[in-house]
């Protein structure tokens, strides 16, 4: 909704009837009426003679008097840019509120919309704060002169009558942008009067005109944030000139054949060398010192990774033909970082007209970074690296349409449900080397094409950028890892390592619109490193890396995002950063929470069968890699916290419903039980390896020690430990009624009665007010007749108020053997208050307020 201004005319206009109609009030002046300028009494005018200017909120489309905003309280006056307020007050004084300063506004938002945009209860907050803007960077003298002129009206005294006084904003014609809506109003009315030859028109235009202004499109802001691009391009071209330092990354290139899941899991335990490549530890991908992995053509190129790309002569026009010429795509204007929708054919024609062999190159630089190509002819020519397909959560855990027998295609060939003699399926097992590995992979791809249910499509992207394109600092959604191969052209990456401090700095930077506009992120982190990629180069960006991208020449790139089980902690951390910085849902990893439940359900099933008794088994299944187990502990804690929201009666209903809707109920029947079962099963395996942290509880941590073997087998020594293990086995062999067995006792059901208050008049001796007497026993608890001086004291009339509060609570639970236990508690609270009136003798002077005594008694 673009900013709108205009002037309203009533049904019976002064020109038509000669009767002056009071102006319509806005939401701010409905009770008091429109404000009057100071000069109205001097000139003998009334409110009917004043030209009230209207302005509409770009968010809710509510109309307001500009004068009411200018004269309103701080909340409403604060919605106007400060420069406009100061200019109006300086040049127009007290009459400034009635001038046409609205002409200087670019965008404006009302106070309720501003408050809602920053409210924690808003389920879909804007990506950037709502801020009123101006048309120009500064207000020119001609703008000030124009604002002081009266609004132009039609010169005709026989203006056609309007059918009603309802305001209906009129959209400006395509390509038309008027500087003065009042002039536009006049010309339209005159043209209509000429066309009707003075006859009153039944369909006369109604309401205020609407000025067409540029709209900010917030799509793709996960990868691109609106910034003054030119200054960053100048900075990266010559960092020393601006006092900055950008280091060459010098990340060593790796052989493509090394990058497999087997290499990722080649380190048996922390601190031990890799069994595949002792010099290249897999922690380079998932450890705290992880860094981008680069494969150059001389190291085997993309094909050595098990991937496949289209032929080298692929052009943007070919991409349009293979994906679909009419396919809509978001095209980003690099100079403003605003995006618009183009067809791929229009994009291809623009690139063709801007190619280097043409005499005149288009000055506008555009960038396409969000073209997902799954299910297209182009997708058949692109195959992600093998390591991506092996560990990608979507490929390995998402439940696509069920195949024959109600099983997912990834479950084919496993035999009956007992799994006797079969190994536990790990990530990527559908791609295991063997006779049917390729067949299962083809089945999975075919299932993706045929499925009617949505799933996260983020693994196949085609990125096309023009020379000079810039994508500002970002972390890919949910800290997902990225594979990135240059088909043609070149790219320059700027990296910031995802350390704890750097992630905090990034969260601060990305959560502030002002910092994104004028702060180089490199000033807030420890260092920035640069990597240059050329045609044929491939790079895998690890989890959570903060990066920006520059395009030195026209380029076509293929890449994709993937989540995995080796950095779940960082993935969950970035999910929270996205929530804290109010990233809209459409810019986050699609269906992330649902995917987490699928992962948990599969791993929990695998761990359950890992310990199952198989009398005819010929092989011994191996537990997941220690790094996967460590990350599953983070996943389990996250899911436990999600189920905690579901069971929290004090949580907002909206939050509880959000968690509930993201749980795949067809697969996960007992979310709390699944989360907690996964937690203790993971802790048991970590305990067996001797890797259970102090923060994780579990009896297995104290009883099982690892012998350090690669497969994590366990050797137990000592009779005492053996006896404990035997006792535990009897417990775990017993079938529980529910997986939530004995996790938490049931909550108390409380019943609190209303207070019972009784007031009576009694005869009691007045107690002493001295502290020494109170200690010695004087007072209500002392013997009757004891006075302050130890002598007898007469009874006096007093008012005794007794309040009794009774509270009971009860809970009941049933054990596995059918035993029912009921517990109840009862508490009685008694408060007594005794009041003696003022004395009528000489002591009344020293104690004019009387005496109040309270006595509390709690009876359990």
Curated annotation (Swiss-Prot):
Single GO MF descriptor: histone H3K36me/H3K36me2 demethylase activity
Comp. bias (Basic and acidic residues): 183-192, 408-433
Cross-referenced InterPro entries: JHD (IPR041070), JHDM1_Histone_Demethylase (IPR050690), JmjC_dom (IPR003347), Zinc_finger_PHD-type_CS (IPR019786), Znf_FYVE_PHD (IPR011011), Znf_PHD (IPR001965), Znf_RING/FYVE/PHD (IPR013083)
Keyword Cell wall biogenesis/degradation: no
Classification via PANTHER family: PHD/F-BOX CONTAINING PROTEIN
Known role: Histone demethylase that specifically demethylates 'Lys-36' of histone H3, thereby playing a central role in histone code.
Zinc finger (PHD-type): 23-116
Coarse class of the protein's main subcellular location: nucleus
Chain residue ranges for the region called Disordered: 1-45, 117-212, 408-440, 744-795, 837-860
Top EC group: oxidoreductase
Cofactor: Fe(2+)
Name of the protein in its database record: JmjC domain-containing histone demethylation protein 1
Composition bias type Polar residues, residue spans: 750-763
Cell location: Nucleus
Organism of derivation: Cryptococcus neoformans var. neoformans serotype D (strain JEC21 / ATCC MYA-565)
Low complexity: compositionally biased ranges: 767-795
Note on how the cofactor is bound: Binds 1 Fe(2+) ion per subunit.
């Amino acid at each position: 909704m673009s900013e709108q201004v205009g002037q309203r005319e009533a049904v019976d206009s002064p020109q038509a009837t000669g009767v002056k109609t009071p102006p319509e009030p806005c939401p701010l002046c409905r009770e008091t009426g429109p404000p009057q300028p100071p000069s109205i009494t001097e000139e003998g005018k009334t409110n009917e003679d004043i030209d009230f200017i209207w302005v509409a909120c770009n968010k809710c489309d509510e109309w307001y008097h500009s004068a009411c905003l200018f004269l309103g309280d701080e909340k409403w006056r604060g919605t106007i840019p400060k420069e406009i307020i100061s200019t109006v007050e300086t040049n127009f004084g007290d009459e400034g509120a009635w001038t046409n300063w609205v002409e200087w506004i670019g965008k404006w938002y009302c106070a309720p919309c501003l408050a809602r945009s920053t409210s924690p209860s808003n389920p879909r907050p804007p990506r950037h704060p709502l801020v009123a803007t101006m048309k120009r960077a500064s207000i020119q003298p001609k703008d000030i002169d124009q604002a002081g002129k009266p609004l132009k009206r039609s010169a005709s005294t026989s203006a056609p009558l309007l059918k009603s006084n309802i305001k209906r904003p009129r959209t400006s014609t395509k390509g038309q942008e008027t500087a003065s809506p009042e002039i536009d109003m006049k010309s339209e009315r005159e043209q209509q009067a000429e066309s009707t030859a003075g006859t009153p028109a039944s369909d006369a235009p109604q309401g205020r005109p609407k000025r067409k202004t540029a709209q900010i499109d917030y799509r793709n802001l996960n990868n691109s944030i609106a910034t003054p691009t030119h200054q960053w391009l100048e900075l990266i071209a010559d960092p020393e000139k601006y006092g900055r330092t950008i280091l060459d990354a010098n990340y060593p290139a790796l052989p493509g054949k090394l990058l497999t899941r087997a290499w990722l899991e080649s380190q048996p335990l922390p601190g031990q060398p890799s069994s595949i490549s002792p010099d290249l530890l897999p922690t380079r991908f998932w450890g705290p010192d992880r860094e981008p992995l680069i494969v150059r053509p001389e190291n085997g190129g993309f094909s050595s990774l098990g991937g496949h790309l289209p032929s080298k002569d692929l052009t943007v026009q070919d991409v349009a033909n293979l994906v679909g010429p009419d396919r809509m795509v978001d095209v980003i204007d690099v100079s403003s970082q605003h995006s618009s929708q183009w067809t791929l054919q229009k994009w291809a024609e623009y690139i063709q007209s801007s190619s280097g062999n043409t005499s005149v190159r288009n000055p506008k630089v555009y960038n396409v970074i969000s073209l997902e190509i799954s299910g297209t002819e182009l997708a058949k020519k692109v195959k992600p690296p093998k390591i991506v397909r092996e560990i990608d959560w979507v490929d390995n855990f998402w439940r696509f349409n069920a195949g024959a027998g109600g099983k997912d295609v990834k479950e084919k060939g496993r035999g009956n449900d007992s799994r006797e003699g079969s190994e536990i399926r790990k990530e990527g097992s559908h791609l295991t080397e063997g006779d049917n590995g390729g067949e299962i992979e083809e089945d999975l791809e075919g299932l993706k094409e045929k499925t009617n249910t949505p799933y996260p499509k983020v693994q196949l992207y085609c990125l096309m950028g023009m020379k000079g394109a810039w994508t500002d600092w970002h972390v890919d959604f949910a800290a997902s890892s990225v594979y990135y191969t240059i088909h043609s052209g070149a790219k320059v990456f700027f990296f910031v390592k995802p350390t704890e401090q750097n992630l905090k700095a990034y969260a601060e930077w990305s959560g502030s619109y002002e910092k994104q506009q004028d702060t180089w992120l490199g000033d807030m982190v420890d260092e920035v490193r640069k990597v240059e990629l050329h045609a044929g180069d491939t790079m895998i960006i690890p989890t959570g890396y903060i990066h920006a991208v520059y395009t030195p020449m026209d380029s076509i790139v293929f890449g994709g995002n993937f989540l995995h089980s080796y950095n779940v902690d960082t993935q969950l951390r970035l999910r929270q950063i996205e929530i804290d910085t109010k990233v809209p849902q459409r810019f986050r990893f699609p269906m992330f929470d649902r995917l987490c439940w699928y992962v948990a359900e599969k791993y929990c099933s695998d761990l359950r069968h890992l310990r199952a008794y198989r009398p005819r088994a010929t092989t011994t299944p191996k537990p997941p890699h220690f790094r996967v187990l460590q990350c599953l502990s983070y996943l389990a804690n996250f899911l436990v916290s999600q189920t905690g929201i579901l069971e929290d009666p004090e949580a907002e209903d909206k939050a509880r419903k959000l968690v509930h809707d993201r749980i795949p109920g067809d697969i996960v029947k007992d979310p709390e039980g699944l989360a907690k079962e996964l937690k203790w099963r993971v802790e048991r395996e970590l305990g067996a390896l001797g890797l259970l942290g102090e923060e994780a509880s579990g009896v297995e941590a104290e009883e099982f020690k690892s012998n350090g073997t690669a497969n994590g087998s366990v050797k137990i020594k000592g009779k005492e430990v053996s006896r404990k293990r035997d006792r535990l086995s009897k417990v775990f062999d017993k079938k529980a009624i529910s997986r939530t067995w004995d996790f938490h006792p049931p909550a108390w059901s409380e019943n609190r009665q209303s207070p019972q208050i009784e007031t009576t008049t009694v005869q009691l001796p007045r107690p002493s007010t001295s502290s020494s007497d109170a200690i010695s026993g004087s007072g209500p608890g002392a013997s009757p007749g004891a006075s302050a001086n130890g002598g007898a004291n007469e009874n006096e009339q007093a008012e005794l108020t007794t309040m009794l509060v009774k509270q009971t609570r009860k809970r009941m639970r049933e054990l596995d053997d059918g035993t029912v236990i009921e517990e109840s508690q009862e508490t009685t609270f008694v408060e007594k208050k005794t009041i003696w009136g003022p004395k009528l003798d000489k002591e009344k002077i020293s104690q004019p307020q009387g005496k109040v005594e309270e006595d509390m008694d709690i009876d359990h």
